[in-house]
Amino acid sequence: MEYRSLNSYMKERFGCKVYKLAINGGFTCPNRDGTIDSRGCIFCSGYGSGDFAEDASLSVTKQIELGKKRVESKMPSGGNGAKSTGKYIAFFQAFTNTYAPVERLRELFTEAIKHPDVVVLSIATRPDCLGEDVLELLSELNEIKPVWVELGLQTIHEKSAEYIRRGYPLKVYEEAVVNLRKRGIEVITHVILGLPGETKEDMLETVRYVGGAIKLPYENAGKDTCSNAGVKESKGENGMYRVQGIKLQLLHVIEGTDLAKDYREGKFECLELDEYVELVRKCIEALPRDMVIHRMTGDGAKKTLVAPLWSADKKRVLNALNNTNEQGGKML
């Protein structure tokens, strides 16, 4: 089983190890402020998936420097005692990172992208929070350094989408992908494995969909090219658009969420480790060989993790996944 890891992709593109730094822009979410809902997605913690991000009261530059220090403290020293260094992805992670006035976004994103050690600006957001002014800003920034947009699709199944309170239909995701790709912006799609009520085939259907292509026409959609060196053409036949990467996320049940309440009431069970490993293997087999696998599991804060408890041992999970991959093939 061959797959293209984020690590190998970044080394291929930038010639060195690239580390991700979680940045907190102090955003909220339309699923929390009452615009769509006030409860948030059913699985989302009070940190808006930014449990490991820095303090939002700090400047972007300060957050980057603090993150760098943490990374560098774990790096091996060279022969002269100096730390080996790499480059960084500035990842705006917590809540919805395009849900603010565009000038505020410009200020935050420009500060990040102009940092000399940042080689990629990555922005996690909702497909329904990508207005024309935001898209134009991202396009401008993409001319300076590569911009990635991470979209939380989670599932293609509307029943599941309603249960998790995603708050938008599949068509909105498709339009967002087209609008980003026609501007040459790379797209990474998040998928949750283990949602209540979904069979393994349901989950594989979502993964196959993400690995496929979105058909035109969508209004104002143009040719799918990318302005950044190192990114392959993503336009399929007959004007079809593809995303460049995927994050496979194990469903984590986090304390304080409505999902935790349902779990404790026995409304669903979480995947076991062996089930998850086999499912990830099938997911990778279902994806195009050139799609970048940005994540195969995920991190949940141990102190608030309700289930599955085996996922708290990330080293064990990654070893199980890597052993399976080594037995079945190689990593590209």
Predicted regions: what is each one?
Residues 30-31, 51-53, 99-101, 255, ...:
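Short catalytic/ligand-binding loop motif for oxyanion handling, primarily in non-cytosolic enzymes
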Residues 51-58, 94-107, 121-183, 193-214, ...:
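Conserved non-cysteine loop/helix-boundary elements of the Radical SAM core domain that shape
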Residues 1-8, 12, 17-19, 217-218, ...:
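Auxiliary Fe-S-binding modules of radical SAM enzymes
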Residues 48-90, 103, 107, 114, ...:
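Conserved alpha-helical substructure of the radical SAM core
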Residues 73-85, 215-241:
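Intrinsically disordered, low-complexity terminal tails and inter-domain linkers enriched
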Residues 14-59:
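Canonical Radical SAM [4Fe-4S] cluster-binding loop centered on the CxxxCxxC motif
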Residues 19-23, 88-90, 121-123, 147-151, ...:
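Hydrophobic faces of well-ordered beta-strands that scaffold small-molecule active sites
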